[in-house]
Structure formats: structure tokens, C-alpha cells
Design a protein with these regions (language model features):
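Bacterial N-terminal signal peptides
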Residues: 1-8
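Binuclear metal-ion centers of metallo-dependent hydrolases, dominated by the metallo-beta-lactamase
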Residues: 202-216, 290, 294-330
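Active-site HxH/HxHxD metal-binding segment of metal-dependent hydrolases
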Residues: 154-212
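N- and C-terminal low-complexity/disordered segments
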Residues: 13-114
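Active-site-proximal loop/helix segments of hydrolase catalytic cores
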Residues: 228-295
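Active-site neighborhood of phospho(di)ester-bond hydrolases with catalytic His/Asp-centered motifs
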Residues: 142-146, 162-173, 190-194, 254-257, ...
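Metallo-beta-lactamase
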Residues: 114-120, 127, 192-251, 324-330
Length: 330
């Protein structure tokens, strides 16, 4: 699991609330042992931004151990991260809660966690290529779920059902009936562009500019996504596909869909996290990704849908902007 913590608030682990089936009180918080320092370094430090300093730890033991690390972020704010370490032979350690909010067991791995302005954790799963998922306030949203890309395969039946699924456009690497069916039950709402709804014979059509509220505190807006370079317009024509902006209690994520830099990007407003496609000739070149990022100015940029594109120089080209390159999003 990858974790990125932003705008954190304090809470308390020592209230007898457990995770992974563990109940009972935590021990009194004290200094970290060498073993606990190693756990923190292995499970938390590589995946947490901003960098956290663990000051104390308390424990809760039963069929494994919960370690509640009491930390400080660079601004001096208190942050609590719970790591569950199972008994030998029962899997590896994992982060199970942040600031008292438990993370779902049946949510895809390879995820990051951001904290919204209300102090709630927002989990972002980087599944592969253009497939993403969000978990917030008990709701799960999937974007362009696809079961297979080349040798990469995902069994979506292993995950919990989605509350909503958003499809950007009807290309095979974004629209997959098998994945949609695996994630859906009678409560799942499907949103897509008109071509995808026609292909699936189900779903609610969203056109550029449409917006709505999925639940209290979760809003969505469909935004333009299209090619502009001469000769590429055939791949993604203007007005056909969508990008999406998701607003989670003020934390705004931009999922660009398949697009090149377009004028509309300058009108998106404040963006905390942006997913931009880098896969020429269908979407952006690396230099176009830089151009788009400079139009949007996200706090964090994650290139996705990038296939074999070499992204190693991208962070250097966007100094002052946090750039995360995630292998699964090829």
C-alpha cells in the first residue's frame, strides 16, 4: 500500500477500538523499540508524504498486533497511523487506519491515502493503465475498470462492489463489460459518455459540463477530453469522451481521460491531484504532459496510461511540483 497524507488532524488510538478483528485496549504509548522502528521504516515511511516522525507507539495484541504510531508531520500536527502485523504465515504487515478512520479490506491494493480538509482519509487505488478507484466516507468509485491489458490481469470479483463506476470513453482499454459486471450490484450507478452507454445498453450519459452529487460531500463533473494535434483527432474527437473532476469535501481530483493539452484545462480551478495520460500518439507526449501540468498546477501529478513512455525525466521538468511515477499505471 502506498500512503500519502495531506492536511492531517489529530485523533486517539487508545480508546479500545481495534482493527482486523482485534478488540481491547491499547497499551500505554511509549518509545519505539528497534523492532518497531523497523516496522515503521518498512511499512509507513516509504509511502507517506509529507515525511512523518514517529514519536510514540502503543500496541494491541490478539491473533497479530496493531501498532498505533503517534507521529508528527513537518508542521507539527499529530498524525496516528495503525499498522497491523499478522501472525507468521498469515500475510504481511499493512496500514489499516489513519487518524481513526479504518480502511476497507476489499479495496484494491497499490493505493495512496490523502486527508481531505474535513480530516477524513481518501484512498486512491492505482490499479493499472487507466483504471483507478477511490474510497471515501464509505463510498467506492471505480474509473475505467478493465480486467486485462496485455499480460496484466485484474480479478475485480475479489473487490467489494462499487457505489459508482465512471467510464471516460468507449475504447477497449477503458470500457470493459466484464469488469463493470464484476463490480456492480443493484445499488451501483454507472456513468459514461454516450458512446459507452450505447455499447453497454445501460448507464447514465454524462456530457462535458454535466455535474452532480454522488452523496453528501462527493461531487463529480464531466470535463472535455480530446486530441488536438493534426492527424490525431480521429483517436479522441472533441465532445465524445470525458475527463472527470471529483470533489471529496474540498479535495479535488482531476482524471483527465484520453486527451492532449486543451484550453479548457486552464478553467478547472484548484486541483489537488491530477492524473494525466502520457502515451503518444494517442494522448500526450512527455513535453505535452509538462504543458498540461503547467496549465493545471496540481499539487500532485501522477502520469498514467503511459505504456512504454520514458517518464524518468518528468520530475526534473516539473520542479516544484510533486510528481509520482507508479509502475502499475503503465
Amino acid at each position: 500500500m502506498m500512503i500519502a497524507l495531506v492536511g492531517l488532524i489529530g485523533c486517539s488510538c487508545g480508546n479500545g477500538t481495534g482493527t482486523k478483528g482485534i478488540t481491547g485496549a491499547y497499551s500505554k504509548a511509549g518509545k519505539l523499540s528497534e523492532e518497531e522502528k523497523a516496522i515503521f521504516s518498512e511499512v509507513v515511511s516509504p509511502y507517506v508524504e509529507p515525511e512523518l516522525k514517529a514519536e510514540k507507539v502503543s500496541r494491541q495484541v490478539f491473533a497479530g498486533t496493531n501498532y498505533c504510531f503517534v507521529c508528527k508531520d513537518p508542521d507539527g500536527k499529530r498524525v496516528e497511523v495503525v499498522v497491523y502485523v499478522p501472525l507468521p504465515g498469515n500475510g504481511g504487515p499493512d496500514i489499516t487506519s489513519v487518524n481513526g478512520e479504518e480502511l476497507m479490506d476489499d479495496f484494491p491494493g497499490n493505493s495512496l491515502v490523502f486527508i481531505t480538509p474535513l480530516g477524513k482519509p481518501l484512498r486512491v487505488a492505482c490499479i493499472f493503465h487507466g483504471s483507478l478507484a477511490f474510497e471515501y466516507d464509505g463510498k467506492v468509485i471505480h474509473i475505467d475498470p478493465v480486467t486485462q491489458m496485455g499480460e496484466m490481469k485484474i480479478d475485480y470479483s475479489a473487490f467489494g462492489k462499487a457505489d459508482a463506476i465512471f467510464i471516460t470513453h468507449a475504447h477497449h482499454d477503458h470500457l470493459c463489460p466484464e469488469a463493470i459486471n464484476a463490480l456492480s450490484d443493484e445499488k451501483t450507478v454507472l456513468f459514461a459518455n454516450a458512446e459507452s452507454v450505447s455499447a453497454l445498453s445501460k448507464g447514465m450519459v454524462l456530457v462535458n459540463g454535466d455535474s452532480g452529487e454522488l452523496s453528501e460531500g462527493i461531487r463529480y463533473t464531466a470535463v472535455p477530453a480530446y486530441n488536438t494535434t493534426e492527424g490525431r483527432e480521429i483517436f479522441h474527437s472533441k465532445g465524445n469522451g470525458n475527463g472527470y473532476i471529483f470533489d471529496f469535501d474540498g479535495f479535488r481530483i482531476y482524471v483527465a481521460g484520453d486527451t492532449e493539452p486543451i484550453d479548457e484545462m486552464s478553467e478547472l480551478g484548484s486541483i489537488d491531484l491530477a492524473f494525466l495520460p502520457v502515451n503518444q500518439p494517442y494522448t500526450m507526449t512527455v513535453s505535452q504532459c509538462v504543458e498540461a501540468a503547467e496549465l493545471i498546477h496540481p499539487k500532485t501529478l501522477i502520469p498514467y496510461h503511459y505504456s512504454d513512455t520514458d517518464l524518468l525525466g518528468l520530475p526534473e521538468m516539473l520542479k516544484g511540483m510533486e510528481v509520482k511515477i507508479i509502475e502499475s499505471l503503465r
